Amino acid sequence: MNQLIQLVESSLGANRFEQVRPGDTVKIQLRVIEGEKERLQAFEGVVISDRGEGGSKTITVRKISHGVGVERIIPVNSPNIESVTVLRHGRARRAKLFYLRKRTGKAALKVKERKTQVNA
């Protein structure tokens, strides 16, 4: 059984979410089918958790829309994901940022910025 799981996960290809960590602000373009039309829907928010490994890995992204918190659990290997853009690298001291759920307004999205090193 373990060999079967490895075979399926190896066929999934490269992971587009390797650089995404909790605390990062990301913009994800998702393919949405409405009736016979297909369009792209952007979801921009803070990654508050990642879960699982390999083919079953998911991330939870949270944003505030019109004063209401909206969370979306996104499977990393979903074929409906068009692109992933990291807008800001956040510095989180926890693996799960569920404490952001209790915050409102600007404080709900406030995560310190992570310093990135430039290799010369």
Swiss-Prot record:
The keyword Iron-sulfur does not apply. One of its GO terms (biological process) is translation. Keywords: Ribonucleoprotein, Ribosomal protein. One of its GO terms (molecular function) is structural constituent of ribosome. GO terms for cellular component: cytosolic large ribosomal subunit. InterPro entries: Ribosomal_bL19 (IPR001857), Ribosomal_bL19_CS (IPR018257), Ribosomal_bL19_sf (IPR038657), Translation_prot_SH3-like_sf (IPR008991). The keyword Membrane does not apply. Belongs to the bacterial ribosomal protein bL19 family. NCBIfam families: rplS_bact. This protein is located at the 30S-50S ribosomal subunit interface and may play a role in the structure and function of the aminoacyl-tRNA binding site. This is Large ribosomal subunit protein bL19. It comes from Chlorobium chlorochromatii (strain CaD3).
